[in-house]
Amino acid sequence: MRRMRSGFKHCAIPIDICRWEYILSPLILQDLQGPQQGGSVAVDVTVRCSVRFVHLPHYGGFNHGTVQRRVDPDDCRILRQLHIVLSLRLCLIDRDRL
């Protein structure tokens, strides 16, 4: 087992844990983007069991004591499965631009 830099052991990754695209609620987008307006934001996520945690970039980089935010079903909906990856990335898209 490989130890992840975020400090927990990564379990075997099920076939359905993939790279996803999400639409997040405006409040979470505002939280992630800070003073920026519009556009898309990409952040790293990790998986503990089936729970995805977002690593917020403006609170520190992925390997620099990142603040994690849990991604709940109420916060987002899955648009489409792109492909299998070990290092997950979350694409946050402004709902108003769709």
Swiss-Prot record:
Q: Which domain of life is it from?
A: Viruses
Per its record, how is this protein called by name? Answer: Uncharacterized protein 029L
